[in-house]
Amino acid sequence: MTPRARPVVLFCLLSGLLAAACGQRGPSAAGGGRTPTIAVIPKGMTHEFWKAIHAGAARAGKELGVEILWKGPQKEDDRAQQITVVEDVINRGVAGIVLAPLDDQALVRPVQDAMRDGIPVVIMDSGLKGRDYVSYVATDNYQGGVLGAKHLGDLLGGRGKILLIRYLEGSESTTQRERGFLDALTKSFSGIDVLVRDQYAGATTETAYQLAENLLGRFPDVQGIFCPNESSTFGTLRALQESRLAGKVKFVGFDSSPKLVQALRDGHIHGLVLQNPVKIGYLGVVQVVRHLRGEKVPDRVDTGVTIATSANMETPEIKALLSPDLSILD
């Protein structure tokens, strides 16, 4: 099938879908015919965040009557494997792709290849340079960093020594969070001294733990820490607990998992900036299907960001974000 012919055929296959993107009623199921396949490609396959993305994508697939192909690299620093996954699903002739790019530059060419081959791509979670894609569905990551800075600054009364433990070079989402965090500190908390701002935790909880352990040894008088994602937050939590500093050092992290939620409850974490990964996965699939149906889709979909603390973690809204329903994956 030629690249020009593919969108026409897919439009016909999907023309029976009765969908509303994000209103009171969800998208309806598809009609008959061959079931289109949407490839959903995360940055990795292990973190709780990606499981929640998968749950959202699966829910959208069920409601829209499309098949979800969930496939990604095992590790969040394996750019080459993610590129290979994108190339593989292009060769399979999927109807569309929803991609969380590991690197904002390295994935540009594969996305361009998909679009040129008539396969629409929706970017989710983390941005991509250029504009060769259909839509971008994500948290306002800069604002997430701002929320983290304001909460940590307030916890410290506007004064103190802190560490910023970055995530991974090339990750657009966490870079935006780190930038928002530092900008907010500069603007509102001049009495806070950032002792470290250029150290990267790496893609795993183990490398994050090793970095945090080293930094806690170098800066025993640190009073606060901010981490921009799940793995850096968990690795740092472990280092704080093993050094008996958990609860003493004000600690604000990002994203959730059962162990991070328990640490918030125990007072070892003082705030978790929360995204809505189920919504990200869900709307990523919705946007690509709407595009295939010939509908106009927004360039940018903001899925929201908030912060969980010990004071609000039992409210229904926050509980749903801290412990999302993943039962559709069972």
Summary of predicted features, one role per range:
Residues 9-20:
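Bacterial N-terminal signal peptides
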